[in-house]
Amino acid sequence: MRQLKGKPKKETSKDKRERKQAMQDARKQVATVVLPTVAVVVLLIVFFVYAATRPGAIA
């Protein structure tokens, strides 16, 4: 039967499996890329605040 343009295609088991795999890969990427990047940015901010407010810099 011909697929109408306005209706979405039904998701097959293969499509569902691929979608689940893509979501799992995205979760792994968050753990390996995003978290270390955020940690480095936070450490840089902490260092700059420390360097700007230490007593030796004021005098």
UniProtKB/Swiss-Prot annotation:
The chain crosses the membrane at residues 32-52. One of its GO terms (cellular component) is membrane. It is found in: Membrane. This is Single-pass membrane and coiled-coil domain-containing protein 4. Residues 1-23 are annotated as: Disordered. Belongs to the SMCO4 family. Residues 9-23 have a biased composition (Basic and acidic residues). Keywords: Coiled coil, Membrane, Transmembrane, Transmembrane helix. Residues 9-30 form a coiled coil. It is a single-pass membrane protein. The lineage of its organism: Eukaryota, Metazoa, Chordata, Craniata, Vertebrata. The keyword Membrane applies. InterPro entries: DUF4519.
